[in-house]
Amino acid sequence: MIIRSPEPEVKILVDRDHIKTSFEEWARPGHFSRTIAKGPDTTTWIWNLHADAHDFDSHTSDLEEISRKVFSAHFGQLSIIFLWLSGMYFHGARFSNYEAWLSDPTHIGPSAQVVWPIVGQEILNGDVGGGFRGIQITSGFFQIWRASGITSELQLYCTAIGALVFAALMLFAGWFHYHKAAPKLAWFQDVESMLNHHLAGLLGLGSLSWAGHQVHVSLPINQFLNAGVDPKEIPLPHEFILNRELLAQLYPSFAEGATPFFTLNWSKYAEFLSFHGGLDPVTGGLWLTDIAHHHLAIAILFLIAGHMYRTNWGIGHGLKDILEAHKGPFTGQGHKGLYEILTTSWHAQLSLNLAMLGSLTIVVAHHMYSMPPYPYLATDYGTQLSLFTHHMWIGGFLIVGAAAHAAIFMVRDYDPTTRYNDLLDRVLRHRDAIISHLNWACIFLGFHSFGLYIHNDTMSALGRPQDMFSDTAIQLQPVFAQWIQNTHALAPGATAPGATASTSLTWGGGDLVAVGGKVALLPIPLGTADFLVHHIHAFTIHVTVLILLKGVLFARSSRLIPDKANLGFRFPCDGPGRGGTCQVSAWDHVFLGLFWMYNSISVVIFHFSWKMQSDVWGSLSDQGVVTHITGGNFAQSSITINGWLRDFLWAQASQVIQSYGSSLSAYGLFFLGAHFVWAFSLMFLFSGRGYWQELIESIVWAHNKLKVAPATQPRALSIVQGRAVGVTHYLLGGIATTWAFFLARIIAVG
């Protein structure tokens, strides 16, 4: 820590009335670009308009102006998010069976959409229980609402209106901070102040206020709900806040107020700030008292973290000092210069944030099922499957985005003349070693992981089960994973004081938790089948990383095209007369990386879906016998490629294929339609631009003959545009197909 004299007095950090508000300007398509604003000559214009509308770098090179546009756009984004949230709460208030679900969450399915009777579409309104007919939803909103203490549709209305007000406020803020009071560049670059405010304000006070809400509102209301009290009889939230006696009846230590806190007798509060571990047997979710405790602890950590960085008072850490001190014996200049990169290149900053947020999103996916945070979430299999799948896809897209913006940084913002022997320079100088080794790892993983399956398929085909890799023949047990599981299962009592169960039931050791005769969670066994598919995961992830990292490290130059940086982020080929130089731009690496990201995530969600149906989800009889949805067939069936096709894809597709004439028929239509969208993508991906240009010229000739030719000349999509359209439809079609397949299946059997 460095003590310095205080900074000078607070500087004026905004420009007033920086840019006038002009609807005429906004009404002109392409007003941000001189060429596009001229209007269309050819149909390429509309594609350029879409490509460049949000590429603020192409509008101006002034970093301050770019920063202001990004900042303003963030408020617009927040406005849309609040609008979306408001819509969700409004549907809960107006069209849902929330109050009925609240009274019997184990037998009634959540629904918040009722289809109007137009051309027979009302067939989609299935019976979700309790006499309500509607579409079963799998977003988890009902479970969140219950956990936060919402007991009536009126409360949902109020929240929806509140979110609308916030949406309007955000829209106003976006306009205000660009047109009326636009921050100066120095404000955007003041990282210490930003860290303090984000850590202490957003994360610290945010967590503290949520912990406060949980203790004073959610916990008492959920206590009543768990005891079977009718939601209409439960006191309203403000009564708990205003009347301490009410809370003291449920949690006696409330009667003592803050005395235990100041006398350091904190264990008094353990009844509502608990440390149980495991799941609440009534709801199958984490103990809400554990969650409140967690948020209080997080709040304290972040409130401390938000006071660590040096701003106006000359005391605390400086980010620049930290980064420049960060060097080891073999790392040259270390992180020297990184501070300048991250305060002048928003692409570099965004790339780091996307990589971390993407990884975090995938961590969330894995915790939502292993430590289900909301009441009755674990027994709602459709929601569990949807939440896992959703967070996996989002994480995958964010990580590809990280590589995209890292490459844009390399092309547009990286200045090789000022960088020498820092870590980034050193990585770039030995990029050949990195990429060739990574390539070797991909080849090794690919042949060996796939080879294990091919061996099993061959042995199975030849009728030699005793020679297969399986739990009953040649075992390949995941011993390290089992060791980690076991360590965690034995941890309670040896690590955290007072913890009665391990963090997750999935580790083993504990009994199963079932709610209303349905399994919430139980110890998940790992065997040869998991070992095999795990190595497929390793293979697909390494290939994705290979493609993306190669795109970043070779974004500026390569042996093939030494002057690649001059060609920009996306270009089709290195000009005429240089064969074999197509598909080398940084953009093309992102394009190719998306396909492998899709491969990776598909295998993960297939693994999850089948494993959970086979070994976890199911019903519990009165005698205590568990019957799993697919009867534990994962261990023996998933060890061959044929098993995946026959017992997972084909066997479980029967629900979506046979959905016509039932309330699930929309999924059947989506399954079909999404396959079409996917197939449509191939037309863009497998076809050349010249083919289409020739076809267009014939069609234009016919239009001219009939004197109906448009003024705007039709043009075939450029190579890059065609690829962008192709990959979009490929991913959209693939994801929607998977969505229909998963939901029709799990709603029918779950």
From Swiss-Prot:
The keyword Transmembrane helix applies. Chlorophyll a' binds at H675. The chain crosses the membrane at residues 70-93, 156-179, 195-219, 291-309, 346-369, 385-411, 433-455, 531-549, 589-610, 664-686, 724-744. One of its GO terms (biological process) is photosynthesis. It is an enzyme of class 1 (oxidoreductase). Chlorophyll a binds at M683, Y691. Keywords: 4Fe-4S, Chlorophyll, Chloroplast, Chromophore, Electron transport, Iron, Iron-sulfur, Magnesium, Membrane, Metal-binding, Oxidoreductase, Photosynthesis, Photosystem I, Plastid, Thylakoid, Transmembrane, Transmembrane helix, Transport. P700 is a chlorophyll a/chlorophyll a' dimer, A0 is one or more chlorophyll a, A1 is one or both phylloquinones and FX is a shared 4Fe-4S iron-sulfur center. [4Fe-4S] cluster binds at C573, C582. It comes from the Eukaryota. It is found in: Plastid, Chloroplast thylakoid membrane. GO terms for cellular component: chloroplast thylakoid membrane; photosystem I. The PsaA/B heterodimer binds the P700 chlorophyll special pair and subsequent electron acceptors. PSI consists of a core antenna complex that captures photons, and an electron transfer chain that converts photonic excitation into a charge separation. The eukaryotic PSI reaction center is composed of at least 11 subunits. Belongs to the PsaA/PsaB family. This is Photosystem I P700 chlorophyll a apoprotein A1. It comes from Jasminum nudiflorum. The lineage of its organism: Eukaryota, Viridiplantae, Streptophyta, Embryophyta, Tracheophyta. The gene is psaA.
